[in-house]
Design a protein with these regions (language model features):
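Residue-level recognition of specific faces of alpha-helices
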Residues: 16-23, 39, 50, 106
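Alpha-helical transmembrane segments
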Residues: 29-40
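Hydrophobic C-terminal alpha-helix "anchor/cap" residues
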Residues: 6, 51, 77-78
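Short, flexible turn/loop "capping" segments at secondary-structure junctions
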Residues: 26-27, 51-54, 99, 208-211
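A short beta-strand structural signal in non-transmembrane regions
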Residues: 58-62, 146-147, 212-215
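A structural signal for hydrophobic secondary-structure junctions
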Residues: 75-197, 201-211
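Membrane-interface junction motifs in transport/secretion proteins
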Residues: 39, 44-74
Length: 215
């Protein structure tokens, strides 16, 4: 309609120039708006899929660590309306080593079966490695960025140094544990460069926590 209007009337040079500039300006504005909305929609989708889907909606931790009577609290949480899933976990910091390469990482001990109901993390582990992820096998899943920094791949072995303390909370020589890389986690984000997972039962054993957890 606008094209017919512009062709159907004879105008002066200045009026025609203004009309052309206005048309181009409107077209550019609409194009920028479309691109901006597309970028926002893509960002929202990635935010939901790669960040919010892998981060728990809430975490509960005891003031005095480790948490020994967590089972009662877990039972109460699971009874709250709207809670889809809940599970215990252990968080600790370690230093992973492969040859001359070192990397500080945040390690999370999780229950492999329950984690599938809690977050989308298992779906970002390459291949079908999560199916074989279980306690008692000296396994660890590390982020893609950590693997690249250490120059390792799935199937390789790494050493992880874990903080060690006695009952009086005095620091001792770090405990060194040899672990097999069971899988690579690739979220294409910052988490890939500082995160690793091990089975919950193994974390309890390495940290001498018995049946206690962090949260």
């Amino acid at each position: 309609m606008g094209l017919r209007f512009s062709r159907g009337r004879r105008r002066g040079g200045m009026v025609s120039l203004i009309s052309v500039i206005s048309t181009i300006g409107i077209a550019l504005g609409v194009a920028v708006l479309i691109v901006g909305l597309s970028a926002m929609n893509g960002f929202e989708r990635e935010l939901n899929n790669r960040i919010l889907a892998v981060v728990p909606h809430g975490e509960i931790e005891a003031v005095n660590q480790p948490w020994t009577n967590w089972q009662e609290a877990l039972d109460n949480v699971q009874k709250v309306p709207g809670i889809a899933a809940a599970a215990p976990y252990i968080n600790f910091t370690g230093l992973v080593e492969s040859g001359a390469n070192l990397r500080a990482i945040q390690v999370k001990g999780v229950n492999p079966q329950q984690e599938q109901h809690l977050s989308a993390l298992p779906s970002f582990v390459q291949g079908d490695a999560w199916r074989n992820f279980k306690a008692g096998e000296q396994q660890i899943i590390i982020g893609k960025g950590v693997a690249d920094a250490l120059k390792v791949k799935q199937g390789d072995w790494v050493s992880i140094m874990i903080p060690n303390s006695n009952p009086e909370h005095k620091l001792m020589q770090p405990k060194r544990v040899r672990l097999h890389i069971a899988g690579i986690l690739q979220l294409s984000g910052q988490l890939d460069h500082s995160f690793a997972m091990i089975p919950l039962a193994d974390a309890q054993q390495y940290l001498d926590m018995g049946s206690s957890v962090s949260g």
